[in-house]
């Protein structure tokens, strides 16, 4: 029977088999070296493998379908003409190289964000120079290029050998009827592989999200298919009808008139400070609440920040809207969540023009300071287009510059240079509002071997059990946070020496949590998927605020309304943020922009409940945060589901409305 099997069919199936084995090899690499399955059952792993293999087979067949159709159409002629031989060899080389590159990018992407490659990754192409440099400084790119050259030679050799071997075999002459049978059967077999299911419904990406453990779900996905499956979720637009319908909900929360859609609230103060206080907002790169020793982390990486928190007003339930530095910078400045599906809102030229509170500090010098270039993610546009007379200090602006990595000068030098600028302004009796963006607590974790009293830990300084319990993925990650902690303390000490400390309101917040493993203290947040959003926010201003802990929920959009209130600086609020120090507001909430089973979604944290729903399919879930089990309790609390659904929908559509209707 095998001898009667057409050579061109053998050629198709052989190549599909080889490519499948090749992709399965990558899946094994991901399983053994990338994924974290310490607390996962064998059954879940088996199920993930089952889905993963089916996704891989689907990709293999789809990848090979164009050449398969050509072979089936030409059958024996395919091995007789040299042009087809060149097409086959070139096709295989390009296919293997392209898939290899994508899979390698996927591994790096997962290490960075704990997520498989998807369409949102296209945002990194908007600043290809920085993204490329980060990759080069973090991964062995040049060694990889040599490996790709070797792969090119190897695939070319194998492709030639296989083609020539099949071509030399005796030709079995078939009738037109049998050729048609083989064509149809092969086509149906390949189609079934793409369909991937014996049920009425084809294999879909959502099936990979079968587990409550996100690591398992991510492992089941195929990066190439996942990229294209998420591509359609990049659409944007305003639904004026829904905005109008749900406006009364957000109007009640913000204290607005319901007569017309307007978010304008004028805030004035009966008394003002004798001397205008300075404001310094420090964005703490990749710092989540879970990493704080103050919150029980056993690594003791933030002993300086922990002490500062005790001397500050600390918001223990503070949430950023969307994980990502660009998203948090945009939200903190504009007072609007970043709900852009494709990239980040900062990159959307149609939405960066906003009426913001930062611009309303009359009589203040306004500054934005960072170690690298302000061109990344169009952040320069967000600041420059909205803040009059803003001065940007970036790489190339400072007196002393020792470039550390792709992010420019490190945090130590950034704080040193910032202190010089603030000291000069203080000496000139010019009040200032400054936004300082740190970066060293970010890959590639370029911490120095010695900086004053700081020294990185080495193997043996911390036992593996403690490192594991702390949730840190690596010693390098831990050292980067310790360096940030050291620099924050050093900066405040310099502020005292320079004379502007007493009259300055310092606000520190994390832009998002970094990728960390599960910890005992924050297991619930890890399981429900909002640990990345929970970050510290504390206002250090001993002259203006007494130290205290605030347990009510606050969100990133509240940053500037809160700070303007502490400074007693009159402002007009056009944003969705509120004063987080308002003790009368007991129904506060956190608004999160999420991915739910691969689909864009939104989440709301309020009164011990966590409500989520997908944007397109409107799939809803409700969880009680204090419960031990992660069980959807929607059926038990229908009134709460209805209330939270209305609030989150109103907030979401109000955000989109303000994107395009809050221009100066």
Model-derived regions, located:
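Generic alpha-helical secondary structure signal
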Residues: 7, 43-44, 82, 122, ...
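Solvent-exposed soluble domains appended to multi-pass membrane proteins
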Residues: 256-664
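Generic detection of long, well-ordered alpha-helical segments
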Residues: 15, 43, 84-94, 121, ...
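Residues that form generic nucleotide/phosphate-binding pockets
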Residues: 52, 56, 134, 157, ...
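Short alpha-helical "patches" and their helix-cap loops
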Residues: 82-86, 238-248, 345-349, 577-578
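Transmembrane and membrane-interface helices of multi-pass
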Residues: 2-237
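The feature marks either
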Residues: 127, 213, 220-225, 229-268, ...
């Amino acid at each position: 029977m095998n001898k009667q099997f057409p050579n061109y069919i053998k050629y198709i199936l052989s190549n599909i088999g080889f490519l499948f084995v090749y992709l399965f090899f990558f899946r094994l690499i991901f399983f053994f070296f990338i994924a974290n399955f310490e607390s996962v059952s064998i059954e879940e792993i088996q199920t993930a493998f089952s889905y993963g293999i089916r996704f891989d087979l689907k990709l293999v067949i789809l990848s090979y379908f164009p050449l398969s159709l050509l072979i089936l159409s030409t059958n024996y002629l395919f091995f007789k003409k040299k042009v087809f031989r060149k097409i086959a060899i070139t096709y295989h080389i390009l296919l293997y190289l392209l898939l290899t590159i994508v899979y390698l990018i996927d591994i790096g992407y997962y290490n960075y964000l704990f997520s498989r490659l998807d369409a949102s990754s296209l945002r990194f192409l908007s600043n290809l120079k920085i993204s490329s440099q980060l990759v080069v400084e973090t991964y062995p790119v040049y060694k990889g290029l040599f490996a790709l050259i070797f792969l090119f030679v190897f695939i070319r050799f194998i492709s030639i050998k296989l083609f020539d071997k099949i071509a030399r075999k005796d030709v079995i002459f078939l009738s037109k009827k049998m050729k048609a049978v083989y064509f149809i059967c092969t086509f149906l077999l390949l189609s079934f592989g793409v369909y991937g299911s014996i049920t009425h419904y084809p294999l879909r990406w959502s099936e990979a999200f079968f587990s409550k453990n996100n690591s398992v779900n991510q492992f089941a996905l195929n990066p190439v298919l996942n990229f294209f499956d998420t591509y359609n979720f990049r659409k944007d637009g305003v639904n004026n009808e829904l905005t109008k319908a749900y406006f009364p909900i957000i109007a009640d929360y913000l204290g607005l008139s319901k007569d017309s859609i307007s978010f304008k609230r004028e805030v004035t103060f009966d008394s003002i400070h004798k001397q205008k206080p300075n404001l310094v907002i420090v964005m703490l790169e990749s710092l989540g609440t879970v990493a704080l020793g103050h919150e029980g982390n056993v690594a003791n990486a933030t002993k300086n920040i922990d002490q500062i928190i005790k001397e500050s007003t600390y918001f223990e339930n503070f949430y950023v809207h969307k994980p990502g530095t660009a998203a948090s910078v945009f939200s903190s400045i504009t007072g609007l969540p970043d709900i852009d599906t494709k990239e980040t809102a900062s990159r959307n030229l149609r939405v960066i023009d906003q009426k913001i509170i930062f611009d309303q500090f009359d009589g203040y010098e306004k500054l934005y300071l960072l170690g690298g270039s302000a061109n990344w993610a169009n952040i320069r546009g967000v600041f420059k287009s909205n803040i009059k007379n803003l001065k940007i200090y970036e790489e190339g602006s400072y007196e002393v510059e020792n470039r550390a990595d792709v992010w420019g000068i490190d945090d130590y030098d950034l704080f040193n240079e910032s202190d010089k600028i603030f000291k000069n302004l203080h000496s000139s009796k010019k009040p200032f509002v400054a936004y300082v963006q740190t970066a060293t607590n970010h890959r590639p974790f370029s911490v120095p071997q010695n900086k004053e009293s700081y020294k990185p830990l080495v193997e043996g300084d911390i036992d593996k059990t403690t490192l594991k319990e702390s949730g840190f993925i690596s010693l390098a990650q831990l050292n980067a946070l310790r360096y940030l902690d050291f620099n924050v303390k050093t900066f405040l000490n310099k502020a005292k020496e320079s004379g502007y400390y007493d009259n300055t309101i310092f606000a520190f917040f994390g832009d998002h949590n970094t990728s960390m493993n599960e910890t005992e203290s924050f297991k619930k947040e890890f399981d429900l998927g909002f640990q990345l959003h929970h970050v510290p926010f504390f206002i250090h201003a001993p002259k203006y605020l007494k130290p205290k802990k605030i347990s009510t929920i606050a969100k990133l959009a509240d940053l500037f309304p809160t700070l303007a209130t502490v400074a007693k600086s009159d402002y007009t609020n056009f944003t969705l943020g509120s004063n987080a120090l308002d003790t009368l507001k007991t129904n506060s909430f956190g608004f999160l922009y999420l991915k739910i089973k691969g689909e864009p979604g939104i989440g709301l944290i309020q009164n011990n409940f966590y409500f989520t729903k997908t944007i397109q399919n409107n799939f809803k879930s409700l969880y009680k945060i204090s419960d031990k089990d992660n069980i959807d309790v929607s059926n038990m609390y229908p009134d709460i589901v209805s209330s939270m659904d209305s609030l989150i929908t109103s907030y979401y559509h109000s955000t989109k409305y303000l994107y395009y209707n809050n221009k100066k």
